[in-house]
């Protein structure tokens, strides 16, 4: 196998990953190995796999991507793979999980220290360790995610195989692709948040070539002044 003999399990707000350090750049996993390790019945189990390595050791990066990391002083790279073995731009929860792992390995700074500059396929992310925060929990990080972009409002149809109904979804680029579907409104015929089947992979049409995350959102309250609402979210990782 092209993975080390010791790997670890990490999570951020329940989004869990198999992680390992590859300082020498000798353990780039195959898609089959990622699927095996992330299998929840026969492997370790996880939403994805993260290899912490140097940008030069990631075979799918081009010279420009490596140069961006170097210019932004990102010596370490988050080589993130989805549980199905496919490559992914990055994962917001994953950036925190792998930075905590980097702390434990003596690579990233401790709380109050210098921010950790982490290379990803979506550019360099900067994480600041805040330590334990009473109102937020243990091992809290502030992440500079960069700019985001929204596509056409309600430009996609979201369905769940085996579940009647559909909802309209809006594309949001957070460095990795998301489609956000508002349910329990006039344009959705899907069940309520509590009744949604989040085990089955949602279908997004028209199809997005890179695949995407899907978020289902219910608007509970909306202020007349600022158009900001409080929402409950059920997340399906795709």
What are these regions (language model features)?
Residues 136-148:
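Membrane helix-loop-helix hairpins that form the core translocation module of multi-pass transporters
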Residues 147-169, 197-198:
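Active-site glycine-rich loop that binds ribose-phosphate moieties when present
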Residues 160-191:
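Internal active-site segments that recognize and position negatively charged phosphoryl groups
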Residues 142-144, 169-171, 234:
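Active-site-proximal beta-strand elements of phosphoester/diester hydrolases
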Residues 1-137, 180-235:
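A glycine-rich beta-to-alpha transition motif near the start of alpha/beta enzyme domains, typified by
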Residues 84-86, 93, 147-153, 175:
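Short, surface-exposed, charge-dense and proline/glycine-enriched linear segments
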């Amino acid at each position: 196998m092209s993975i080390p003999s010791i790997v670890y399990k990490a999570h951020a707000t329940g989004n869990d990953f198999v992680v390992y350090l590859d300082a020498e750049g000798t353990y780039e996993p195959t898609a089959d190995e990622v699927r095996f390790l992330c299998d929840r019945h026969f492997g370790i189990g996880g939403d994805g796999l993260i290899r912490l390595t140097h940008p030069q050791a990631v075979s799918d990066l081009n010279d420009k991507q490596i140069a961006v990391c170097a210019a932004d002083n990102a010596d370490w790279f988050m080589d993130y793979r989805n549980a199905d073995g496919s490559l992914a731009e990055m994962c917001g929860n994953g950036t925190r999980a792998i930075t905590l792992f980097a702390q434990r390995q003596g690579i990233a700074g401790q709380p109050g220290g210098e921010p950790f500059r982490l290379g990803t396929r979506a550019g360099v992310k900067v994480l600041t360790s805040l330590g334990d925060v009473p109102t937020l929990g243990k091992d809290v990080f502030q992440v500079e995610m960069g700019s985001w972009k929204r596509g056409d409002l309600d430009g996609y149809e979201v369905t769940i195989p085996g579940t009647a109904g559909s909802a309209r979804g809006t594309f949001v680029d957070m460095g990795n692709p998301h489609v956000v579907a508002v349910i329990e409104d006039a344009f959705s015929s899907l069940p309520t948040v509590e009744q949604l089947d989040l085990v089955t992979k949602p279908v997004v049409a028209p199809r997005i070539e890179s695949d995407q995350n899907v978020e289902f959102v219910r608007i509970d309250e909306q202020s007349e002044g600022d158009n900001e609402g409080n929402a409950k979210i059920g997340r399906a990782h795709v």
